[in-house]
From Swiss-Prot:
InterPro entries: Enolpyruvate_Tfrase_dom (IPR001986), Enolpyruvate_Tfrase_sf (IPR036968), MurA_subfamily (IPR050068), RNA3'P_cycl/enolpyr_Trfase_a/b (IPR013792), UDP_GlcNAc_COvinyl_MurA (IPR005750). The lineage of its organism: Bacteria, Pseudomonadati, Pseudomonadota, Gammaproteobacteria, Lysobacterales. Cell wall formation. Adds enolpyruvyl to UDP-N-acetylglucosamine. This is UDP-N-acetylglucosamine 1-carboxyvinyltransferase. It catalyses: phosphoenolpyruvate + UDP-N-acetyl-alpha-D-glucosamine = UDP-N-acetyl-3-O-(1-carboxyvinyl)-alpha-D-glucosamine + phosphate. One of its GO terms (biological process) is cell division. The gene is murA.
């Protein structure tokens, strides 16, 4: 099993290219099933979850080809959905990735039937699929859950437009319903919809393929269904979580970094907290520069919340920052009930953290000490790498398969910025 070894003490300096967004490319790849011709998706990150989604699409019968790009947009994937004949998504592929549930809406909407195994993914708390099921039922779907599978069908040919109000904000629930509504008969209204940039990116992709959607990025989305989407091309937006992770890493190490072709407007909450921590930040239309040279960060308080609030996917990274910051920082997690699993590993490095329910109180220390640690989920693994970058000695991070689900070549990118980091098998 692979491990990552980090030797701390070197400030990160230089330029980095941010990959396409993991949380956007997965629903967009699912949405290609709605088209009646090939769809080319560019700026695709090379991640374990992307490979899993490709394998799922191929299992359904779709033709999938990956093309390596030589320009800034990177690699592209072309999906030809015209060969889809299978409507069952098996457990052996689904078990490693929760986003596989995003195939439910497109399969049901286009083929009138879908059978998707209940999903897996990071073990960071309960993320039920009941919102997906109820949303699709509002469009006329008949759904049961039997033997670990969601079994859905449409008895009257096509899904019918309807109105659905989410009990709680659900990103993947909004995406599933949005895709299904795009080819349903009539008008659908989605209330209390997720407003995340990745939802907007999916909507813009659907529109590029012929969908009629208004209100994406607001709590109310209106979809006028069309019979089928067309083929086309679309470029995935840059990954805001990877962007934030590299910014925090640079701030922690007292470095300087420049990023081009990013979306600063999707990172207001993160950039605000980094400024509060003492970083000097310059923002352009599609660029971010951060300078923390010669300074120790100040602790920050934060509470996770749905977009445009502070993203839960950046909570672990800011906890790592607070571990070596000056002062005491309080972090409240409101999205998932089990997302402090990285705390025990940070304690092994010498961090001072006290947990009180859904709140972590972090007393900053001047330095951490390298030690063997174990990744427990995707973002926790990133926080351990960040902590290793500022720890004395070597930090060895085990179970990094979590990391490969969401970060493309993170050791190569950090190494290019000056970090002493390597993968060990």
């Amino acid at each position: 099993m692979s491990k990552i070894v980090v030797a701390g003490g070197t400030p990160l300096c230089g330029d980095v290219r941010i990959s396409g967004a993991k949380n956007a490319v997965l629903p967009i790849l699912s949405a290609t099933l709605l088209a009646d011709a090939p769809v080319e998706i560019s700026n695709v990150p090379y991640l374990h979850d992307v490979i899993t989604m490709i394998n799922l699409l191929r299992e359904l019968g779709a033709g999938v080809t990956m093309n390596e790009g030589i320009e800034a947009k990177g690699r592209s994937i072309t999906v030809d959905p015209r060969w889809v004949r299978q409507h069952m998504v098996p457990y052996d592929l689904v078990k490693t990735m929760r986003a596989s549930v995003l195939l439910l809406g497109p399969l049901l909407a286009c083929y009138g039937a879908a059978e998707v195994a209940l999903p897996g993914g990071c073990a960071i708390g309960s993320r039920p699929v009941d919102q997906h099921i109820r949303g699709l039922q509002s469009l006329g779907a008949e759904i049961t859950v039997e033997n670990g599978y969601i079994k859905a069908s449409v008895s009257q040919g096509r899904l019918k437009g309807g109105r659905f109000v989410f009990d709680v904000v659900s990103v993947t629930g909004t995406e599933n319903l949005l895709m299904a509504a795009a080819v349903a008969q009539g008008t659908s209204v989605i209330e209390n919809a997720a407003m995340e940039p990745e939802v907007v990116d999916l909507a813009e992709c659907l529109i590029a393929l012929g969908a009629r959607i208004e209100g994406a990025g607001t709590p109310r989305i209106v979809v006028e269904g069309v019979e089928r989407l067309k083929g086309g091309q679309y470029a995935v937006l840059p990954d805001r979580i990877e962007t934030g992770t590299f910014l925090v890493a640079t701030a922690m190490t007292g470095g300087r970094i420049s990023m081009q072709q990013v979306r600063p407007q999707t990172l207001d909450a993160v950039l605000g907290k980094l400024t509060e921590a003492g970083a000097c930040i310059e923002i352009g239309e599609d660029s971010i520069r951060l300078d923390m040279q010669g300074r120790r960060p100040c602790s920050v308080n934060l509470t996770t919340a749905p977009y445009p609030g502070f993203p839960t996917d950046m909570q672990a990274q800011f906890m790592a920052l607070n571990c070596v910051a000056e002062g005491v920082g309080v972090i409240k997690e409101t999205i998932f009930e089990n997302r402090f699993m990285h705390v025990d590993e940070l304690l092994r490095l010498g961090a001072k953290i006290q947990i009180e329910g859904h709140t972590a109180i972090v007393q900053g220390v001047e330095r951490l000490s390298g030690a063997p640690v174990m990744a427990t989920d995707l973002r926790a693994s990133a926080s351990l790498i960040l902590a290793g970058l500022v720890a004395e000695g070597e930090t060895i991070i085990d179970r990094i398969y979590h990391l490969d689900r969401g970060y493309e070549n993170i050791e190569g990118k950090l190494g290019a910025l000056g970090a002493s980091i390597r993968r060990m098998t």
